[in-house]
Amino acid sequence: MADRLMTVNAYTTLDLVDGEAKGHGFTEEAFATLNVTSPRKNPDHVSLQLELDPTELDTLAPHADSVRLSPEQARKLAADLEKHAKNVEQA
C-alpha cells in the first residue's frame, strides 16, 4: 500500500484483507489492513484500526478508521467473531 497511514510490521494483526467502504451513493472495495493494539504504557483500552488501500479508492481520501474498546467490549467482539467464524466453517 502506497501512502499508508498505519504502521504495518510483523506484529500487524491482518496486513492484507478484503475491505469495503460504503457511503451515500458509492461503494468502494480495496485491500485493507486490520490491526488490534493496546497502549504499551498504562493500557486502558484496545484499539481496532482499519485502513483501505488508498491507491484502490476513487471517492475516499486516504484515511484510517479506529475505535477504542474497553476490555469488556473487546471480549464481546472476540466472542462474536468466534461465533460467526464457526458458523461460516460449518456452512
Give the positions of each predicted feature:
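Positively charged, low-complexity terminal tracts
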Residues: 1-91
